[in-house]
């Protein structure tokens, strides 16, 4: 019946055009009439097996629902005001109020959308007739549907139904974005939040995320008689159970990697530790080393081994091979015992503790320091504190994708305003920390179309196990945030922008970046969605000394972890960070490949003296355990 109905609506003689019509169509592959034989992969062949598998999939879905509901019934999970859904509803209601409050405004917006829909519908009807309309006129230009990996399957354009859905989706997404941008009377933060939430909704409602509206999913479901859904719903239940009531999105095969076995392999020793960190010294691989040791302060929002994923990608190993004596702070994965550990504690018991350890192990008081992301923000604040205290141990500082000014801090600012922060602080007070899954989801939401929905479709609708990928393993190996530390960071940096306003109080002292006179290598990545290059650029001008501002290709991770042997990307140098970022970048000099050798040369320019290679701990400190240590092994 289904096949006959299709043939009545779309007779083959109307859908298959002759060669003259085809040659008269638009260039660049404008399609001829639709061939009904293309529907064969979409026709159900074994309804009985499909029905049985559908029942099995529903059974697995019920198990997923039970895994989600059970901890809530036991009171182990309570929905709180920090749920993004709560703020999203409040924010988008303001957009809705603006457009509904004026009938003329409402009518104009609806007319624009309906006009776009009508154009798409007319084109779809004409495509049913062939490459030209019923009167022989050329088809109207196809709306801009842009390149999008979600719609790479050829049937998104070849099949009129899916082509129609695709075009409607893009037109509707653009229309909703325009509603936000043209809403008057909203403050900048609220409009930013509204735009962000609209992108989340449109990403979630993409036709690529549903079986009935995704040609590839539909064909695979028909071809396997629904076996993909049985597997997918089983994995969904497993992942909700693994997350103890929250979905732990399956992005990679977590069983294929282990820290210390497959990653974080650079030889070294843990030579000191306290409540919040371990200090690792790596074994030398050269006969001589630079006199000044190198201290790396990584972020605590993720784990340090992003800089030591494997020997081929390891920044740490590369530094060791260049003759650097490398020390790394490995932060604890905090729990309730660390609730009161604030920024001052991380500065004193982290960076200062590491500097004291380095002096004991090497006898050196002068150090080169590197800070990555929030680790760089802490390093910058600690440098300002040291300047206030006349502490001159750190002689140069390198900042990877580090924000010190948060004026242009990007989409993470969506999650920080007084109302949301107060709710978050109340939530953290109960346990003493913020669970790592909350931060992980926030980061994934920044690129939902790349980091959430493709994996949702692949795992739970296609029923495919994800491929092993070391970077995604690291991304999923999230950490908790100590309550006092996280609250200080969000309130003083994202909310108040206190560090560049000379309003930050650290360990009882008001600090200023203008007091930081040492040379700084400030690295931004061009496509960074966490620490935008424009934000890093602006931050460069608040230091009191010379800043070498460098921009590298790619994003927050790939731009930093870019070994020279890969011959990927490029970097730009162009003198002081003055004027506008866009102008600076246009005038900067581009160099192909990795920025690592450029940075190494910068380090040696400031002190290239060498001494005999050192052993971990020297004569003063005994090894506690092998690198990468036990703190990094603690899973959330």
UniProtKB/Swiss-Prot annotation:
It is found in: Cytoplasm. SUPFAM superfamilies: alpha/beta-Hydrolases (SSF53474). GO terms for biological process: poly-hydroxybutyrate biosynthetic process. Residues 1-38, 129-152 are annotated as: Disordered. Pathway: Biopolymer metabolism; poly-(R)-3-hydroxybutanoate biosynthesis. It is an enzyme of class 2 (transferase). It catalyses: (3R)-3-hydroxybutanoyl-CoA + [(3R)-hydroxybutanoate](n) = [(3R)-hydroxybutanoate](n+1) + CoA. Keywords: Acyltransferase, Cytoplasm, PHB biosynthesis, Transferase. Residues 143-152 have a biased composition (Basic and acidic residues). The keyword Acyltransferase applies. The active site is at residue 373. It comes from the Bacteria. Its EC number is 2.3.1.-. One of its GO terms (molecular function) is acyltransferase activity. GO terms for cellular component: cytoplasm. Polymerizes D(-)-3-hydroxybutyryl-CoA to create PHB which consists of thousands of hydroxybutyrate molecules linked end to end. PHB serves as an intracellular energy reserve material when cells grow under conditions of nutrient limitation. Belongs to the PHA/PHB synthase family. Type I PhaC subfamily. This is Poly(3-hydroxyalkanoate) polymerase subunit PhaC.
